[in-house]
From Swiss-Prot:
It is an enzyme of class 3 (hydrolase). It comes from Brucella suis (strain ATCC 23445 / NCTC 10510). Residues 192-250 are annotated as: Disordered. HAMAP family: Pept_tRNA_hydro_bact. It comes from the Bacteria. Keywords: Cytoplasm, Hydrolase, RNA-binding, tRNA-binding. Hydrolyzes ribosome-free peptidyl-tRNAs (with 1 or more amino acids incorporated), which drop off the ribosome during protein synthesis, or as a result of ribosome stalling. Catalyzes the release of premature peptidyl moieties from peptidyl-tRNA molecules trapped in stalled 50S ribosomal subunits, and thus maintains levels of free tRNAs and 50S ribosomes. Belongs to the PTH family. This is Peptidyl-tRNA hydrolase. NCBIfam families: pth. GO terms for biological process: protein quality control for misfolded or incompletely synthesized proteins; rescue of stalled ribosome.
Length: 250
């Protein structure tokens, strides 16, 4: 069994918060695949289904973000799962909006929901070696702005990339069930248009890079390169005078 936990805060007032992007991903997976109805258990909303032959349990902890580990730990003990069977989906300030990264293990990175889960995973074999799916929401720019930023709603302008990201995660979730994390990340990147790009989102054709003109030189350097070498006589009175003047020896 694979347990996919989306993190967030319960209640309609938090539904569209940046901090709730994990809930949004879980909801989209639920909508696009065949799952049982949501039910309340393990201090969470849960739904079970089968994806690519693997039984999957969706979990949305209702404990509030900072106590997410209580709910997830309870569900894992009930089903006798290990951290290798767990994928946690949550918001990441240090990734630009629309970026996705998956890794196994690591630290909480200042995320209180992950801190709670890490604490509860210490009692399981394998400890904190569960898979973490980080969904980029961007950073407000200053530490003192973070609290209001993560608990603020996504802007309308975010809907285009947000809908695309949620759909791509849900459509390719079978790769998670098969533990094909790198292929999953590549598929999401393609869906988000993250192919060959320069900073600022400008796509670059590798063939164009190969044909790029050489770097321009300053007009002074060009003049020096084009300057003809002086015609210095090799023999005669002038040559003898220059040898004495420049100290040139035969």
């Amino acid at each position: 069994m694979l347990l996919i936990a989306g993190l967030g805060n319960p209640g309609p007032q938090y539904a569209h918060n940046r901090h709730n992007i994990g809930f949004m991903a879980a909801d989209e997976i639920f909508r696009r695949h065949r799952f049982s109805n949501w039910q309340k258990k393990f201090q969470a909303e849960i739904a079970d289904g089968v994806i690519d032959g693997e039984k999957v349990l969706l979990v949305k902890p209702q404990t509030f973000m900072n106590l997410s580990g209580q709910s997830i730990g309870e569900a894992m003990r009930f089903y006798k799962l290990t951290p290798a069977d767990l994928v946690v989906i949550y918001d990441e300030l240090d990734l630009v909006p629309g970026k996705l990264r998956i890794k196994t293990g690591g630290g909480p990175g200042g995320h209180n929901g992950i801190k709670s889960i890490d604490a509860h995973m210490q009692s399981f074999p394998g400890g904190q070696n569960y898979r973490r799916m980080r969904l980029g929401i961007g950073h407000p720019g200053a530490k003192e702005l973070v609290h209001n930023y993560v608990l603020g709603d996504f802007a309308k302008a975010d809907n285009e990339w947000l809908d695309t990201l949620m759909g791509a995660v849900a459509d390719n979730v079978a790769m998670l069930a098969r533990r094909e994390d790198n292929s999953f990340m590549n598929r999401i990147a393609l869906a988000m248009g993250d192919g060959n790009q320069r900073p600022g989102g400008v796509k670059t054709d590798p063939a164009q890079l190969e044909k790029a003109p050489p770097k321009a030189q300053s007009h002074i350097r060009q003049a020096r390169q084009n300057q003809k070498k002086p015609n210095i006589p090799e023999s005669g009175p002038m040559a003898e005078m220059l040898k004495k003047l420049l100290g040139k020896k035969d």
